[in-house]
Amino acid sequence: RSIMSIKKQFLWINIIGGLSVLGGYVYALIDHPVLRAQIWGGVPETWQPWITMFMFISGFGYCYGMYYLIFNEGLNLKFFGGKYEASIMRTLLILFLVSASMWIHSTFNYLELPNAKSWNMIRIELWCTALSILFMTVGLATAKGIKNIKVHKLSVVGLGIISFHCLVFDAILWTSNFPTDF
């Protein structure tokens, strides 16, 4: 496959996956007006505005990282110390977007009918989301063949920000504070 083909794949994966994630959030929040306030779980109210602000910063970081990969030299690189082609990043991207699109629906299912199986599914989804974007960040940070060092570093920072958010705020903080009733 040519580089142009992988670029188109990345673009379409982001369009479809991004719409699935964001559209899924909108649908889930509109569909559950009574439970909507409970989606924060036990995260302290004073932290919520800061985490919300960081969500937008994380989204920008993700978009910058994807810009570099799709429209700059990113997909021409050899990832994870020069050992892998862009196809590994495509796999991680799909895993990231699929798992990111699932957790909110699983959470509302759990809020409606709390049980250990649903709770474990949420945790698996959040950890898959966090680890897949973290591995993308590591893959990009350790890539070989970089020509535009400044843009590369900024894209690593961008993916690092969303990795931090998904790992620390979602997979660790949110799951640690969410009340479980089983």
Predicted regions and their residues:
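Membrane-interface interhelical loops and short amphipathic "cap" helices
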Residues: 30-48, 107-121, 174-182
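Terminal transmembrane helical module of multi-pass membrane proteins
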Residues: 132-182
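Membrane-proximal helix-loop-helix units in multi-pass membrane proteins
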Residues: 75-135
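Alpha-helical transmembrane segments of multi-pass membrane proteins
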Residues: 17-33, 168-172
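Juxtamembrane loop-transmembrane helix junctions in multi-pass integral membrane proteins
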Residues: 5-8, 39-49, 80-87, 117-120, ...
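Alpha-helical transmembrane segments and their helix-start/interface "positive-inside/aromatic belt" motifs
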Residues: 4-18, 86-88, 146-161
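Internal transmembrane alpha-helix with an interfacial aromatic "cap," most often the third helix
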Residues: 23-32, 56-81, 139-140
